[in-house]
Amino acid sequence: MQKETQFNVVLDIGKTNVKLYLLHKNNSVVKIFKTKQKVHFYKRKIKLLDAPQLIDWFLKKLKIISKKHSLNKFVCTAHACSLAFIDEKDEEIIAVTDYEYQFDKFAKEYKKILPSFNKTYTPLLEGGLNLGQQIYFLSKQFPEVLKKTKFILSYPQYISWKLSNTFSSEISYIGCHSHFWNHSSSKYSSIINKFKIRKKLPKIRKAWKIIGKIKINNKVLKILNGVHDSNASYLYFKNSNLKNFTLISSGTWYIIFNQKTKLKELKANLDMLCNIDVFGNTVPTMRFMGGREFDELIKKLKITAINRHSITKDLLKKYLIYPSFASAGPFKKSTQSLNLIKKLSNNEKYGLVCIYITFVLHFCLNVMNSNNNIILDGPITKNNTMIKILSSLRSKQKIYIHSKEIGTGLGASILFNIKKKNNLFLTEVLPDNKINYEHYYDLWFNQIKEKKLVNIPRG
């Protein structure tokens, strides 16, 4: 009797968009279901992401899927800096925090108790982009939350708990610009003891660990612990035979990973930090909200019906866009008027937006001392204008895109068989040499220095 084919499932929670992947055992995509994150509030005051509603959505989809397909394993990957607080009755007090809420109300006080940067390698960030800052805010404004809390769960581990009834933590999430982790000692940082929450953090388990099971239409689905999203993207390439590379993971956030960057080269004010991969290795990173800025500029400049970019030397002599149009990242918020640029054609405006995002990316790669091969992943791989300009700017490096976009969802699928090495199918990006983009980057960066747009340390 032929054995029934089993399928795996990945829940990929981005800050805006959510995808549920049904995957064949070889990790090829069978079907994708999509939705968006919704919000609700704690006591009508703290804006939260509505994780319980999201669970209802994907459980309904799993029931539909399981009628036609035999399911094997499930894993969740999610963006950083969202926490769930669970009480003694195993009920949610908060599920889950939204890092774009103003958790930094007490930033000046919080900064005084922080471990030094050379221990956590995590800068003081805006809003709730540090988990420690979220905890400090709650201790000041809503102390009853921490008092009632039995366990604090990261977003992927909240999802896995709801399915498996097992409480867990995971290193790639705990170590992601949280202030929770001391990279020098590979232990929890001193702030955990100051908050007195060590016992509220469940046991750290491997991202690929099967922590429980759930029955869907009488079919057993094994639940994996789960992983931080951009670390899932990194894992796909890390778990190949590629030894030395810089990865640019794109989406709402553009995150640059380069294991060759030295920890001592990280600068807190430039949004540089240290992540940890699923194996526990330190990974120096730098980030900015490239996807968010791109969308914001498309909206501000009212760009529609784009056929192709119209980038000329005459255009670049007159117009350039300067940072920045989103929070976080290495640059201050923009005060630039876009009125003159708004009068240009759609194709000209689109070209300037592409150049702006690529210039910021080039700046980040310079600061990260990236001199190895560069791999692009995520939506940026579909933007032919940007990747060719980047290839022109990084003339001493080779830039590759994978034959298929990996992203966080397919990156997380590697956890289903962590021992298997990936075969990469890389295509080199050829440069656009019609214009000397390095010349215009130098003009752009000189203006940034004159305008003093580079961030000073926060706090």
Place the predicted regions along the sequence by residue.
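N-terminal glycine/serine-rich phosphate-binding loop of ATP-dependent small-molecule kinases
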Residues: 1-95, 148, 203, 219-225, ...
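Active-site core segments that coordinate phosphate-bearing ligands/cofactors
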Residues: 2, 19, 111-124, 130-150, ...
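Short, acidic/turn-prone active-site loops that include or flank metal/cofactor-
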Residues: 34-40, 97-104, 252-254, 403-407
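Active-site phosphate-binding/coordination module
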Residues: 68-131
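Nucleotide/phosphate-binding loop and acidic/charged catalytic motifs
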Residues: 74, 169-175
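Glycine-rich phosphate-binding loop of ATP-grasp-fold ATP-dependent ligases
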Residues: 93, 173-180
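A conserved helix-loop-beta module that forms one wall/lid of the active-site cleft
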Residues: 193-209
